[in-house]
Amino acid sequence: MSQKQLPPVKVRDPTTGKEVELTPIKVWKLSPRGRRGVKIGLFKSPETGKYFRAKVPDDYPETG
């Protein structure tokens, strides 16, 4: 199976405090009941190897 390469997103890495450009591992919509939701991405810090979540743009494609 071939997956499309998603474009990188500029996010702040909470483990190092630096602004980095990363491609999310997974993207999903998080929406509370009765309100408009936001898209969240799962990222892996290149320096520490820890995983973190951050908001991605609303027009970003969702993954599995």
Curated annotation (Swiss-Prot):
PTM summary: Methylated at multiple sites, to varying extents.
Summary of subunit composition and partner proteins: Monomer.
Keywords, alphabetical: Chromosome, Cytoplasm, DNA-binding, Methylation
Lineage top rank: taxon: Archaea
Encoding gene, per UniProt annotation: creN7
UniProt xrefs under InterPro entries: Cren7_sf, dsDNA-bd_Cren7
Homology family: Belongs to the Cren7 family.
Gene3D superfamilies cross-referenced by the UniProt entry: Chromatin protein Cren7 (2.30.30.610)
Gene Ontology MF term list: double-stranded DNA binding
Main location: cytoplasm
Compartments reported by the entry: Chromosome; Cytoplasm
Role of this protein: A chromatin protein, binds double-stranded DNA without sequence specificity. Constrains negative DNA supercoils.
GO cellular component entries: chromosome; cytoplasm
Protein name: Chromatin protein Cren7
